[in-house]
Amino acid sequence: MSRLFMILLVICVITLGTDASQAEDSGTEKKSWPMPDADLKAFQSWPLTDPDLKSAFKQYNWQRMPYGTRK
């Protein structure tokens, strides 16, 4: 029983040690859900200055405002 416990302990220490060393080597925190490059490029090129998008956003926010705060 104690051998099994020691083996599991060693495996856990090795696993945690490699995760920590990889995070230190990269200089950033380890991300659990990385975004694919294609999705990131599509998101960055999305036209945030589109007038239709702005008007729709303002209209949606206007509808969400509580009654009595509209000017």
Curated annotation (Swiss-Prot):
Misc: The mature peptide does not contain cysteine residue.
Tissue note: Expressed by the venom duct.
Subcellular localization(s) per the UniProt record: Secreted
Organism per entry: Conus planorbis (Planorbis cone)
A single MF term (Gene Ontology): toxin activity
The organism's place on the tree of life at top rank: Eukaryota
Function, as annotated: Probable neurotoxin with unknown target. Possibly targets ion channels.
Signal peptide limits: 1-20
Protein name: Conotoxin Pl064
Any one annotated GO CC term: extracellular region
Sequence similarity: Belongs to the conotoxin NSf-1 superfamily.
Pro-sequence residue ranges: 21-28
UniProt keyword list: Cleavage on pair of basic residues, Ion channel impairing toxin, Neurotoxin, Secreted, Signal, Toxin
